[in-house]
Amino acid sequence: MNKSTIKALYFDLDHTLWDFEKNSALAFKTLFKQYEIGLKLDEFLKVYVPNNTAYWRLFREGKIDKEKLRYERLKTVFDRLNYQASDLLIYDLADAYIQTLPEYNTLFPGAISILETLKSHYALHMITNGFKDVQHFKMKNSGLLPYFETITDSSSVGKKKPDPEIFNYALKVGGVRPSEAVMIGDSLEADVEGALNVGMHAIHFMPVVRRNPTHYKEIEQLEELTFFL
């Protein structure tokens, strides 16, 4: 990758700039008190976090819709923990979670400072598989919104990363060719491989070090983007 030819950077949001797991835990902490959920939060999260990842994969692959994602990711966790939760409670909790989540705005360390540095040299864009209304509030409340020229979300395009269509759409609205753009995200499949498949460059953000490193460009901290850009 020759950085002199790069004009635009495309970021993922959740797990890349916006610390999803930390903010999600804070949201559930609030909701467990509000709804008087009789479970220890850490025990719930131990099951919920990988379960949520699995359900998001199904959603990304088009095997379930948004409503099933929101309901099933909670229902299955309560079932595994043998906690009696009515459908009414689960639906109410699912809706409240979506409303509460954007109220917490923890970003990964260095997020704002690296965006400040990069915006002087590149056009910054966002590509996200998250729900449009929720993602907008996350970006607004966390101070990320002013840094990005365009935001491409899967609900507006009708395709989710790693589908080539969402990348090509984002490149078109950003006014750049694939060879002039870099995708930065935490998902090897959705962000890195999806971008590479349309001719973009890609950098894999992995704040949790993996035992088996890949052959892709990788960073563990956002500030390390300056090594490549």
Where are these regions (language model features)?
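N-terminal helical cap/lid subdomain that shapes the substrate entry/recognition surface
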Residues: 3-13, 17-109
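Residue-level marker of alpha-helix boundaries and capping positions
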Residues: 65, 105, 126, 182-183
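Glycine-centered short loops/turns at secondary-structure junctions
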Residues: 121-122, 199
